Amino acid sequence: MVKMGIGYDIHPLKKGSHLVVGGTKISGEFSSDGHSDGDALIHAIIDAILGAANLGDIGQFFPSDEKKWKGMDSTHFLSTTIKKVLSVGYKLEHVDTVVILQKPEIRQFVSKIQHKLAHVLQTNKENISIKATTADHLGFIGTSEGWGALAIASLSKLE
């Protein structure tokens, strides 16, 4: 049986030197403002995976009010999540994502992001889809006040 989960995350942007997207540092004028490293893409993927396995959400496992997660690399959260899901008998089949960010342009980093996520998720790069779009200068994303990501994950139950 294949199970599906959906995830969504947004973070404010602040002046900075780089943005972390899918565990990949992208140089630019903005950084994500979050309790951890503010990687909205990974946070959305985590919620999608946990949802598909009916295990809750990112806040239950990594609460943003716990000091130990302050500044944490979100790949740690993702690695812990996939290990948990594997331990209860699921296999990751596919992750499909959309990153919504006005700037910087991330299309040239998609392959690198896929490779990083595939490594952390213990799967093939072909099982990770990353799409990038802008908000066409509309709303808080369009004015570069924030960014967001959507993710859908499919898991199969191992027999």
What would you call each of these model-derived segments?
Residues V2-S111, L121:
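RNase III-family endoribonuclease catalytic core
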Residues D65, I130-T134:
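Pyridoxal 5′-phosphate
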Residues T97-L101, I130, A151-A153:
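A structural signal for short, well-ordered beta-strand segments
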Residues Q114:
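Generic structural marker for isolated residues within well-ordered, non-membrane alpha-helices
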Residues L117:
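Glycine-rich, mobile lid/loop segments that gate access to catalytic sites or pores
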Residues N124-N127:
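Short acidic capping loops at alpha-helix termini that bridge into adjacent secondary structure
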Residues T134-I141:
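Short, surface-exposed loop/turn segments at secondary-structure boundaries that line and modulate
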Residues I141-E159:
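C-terminal edge-of-domain segments
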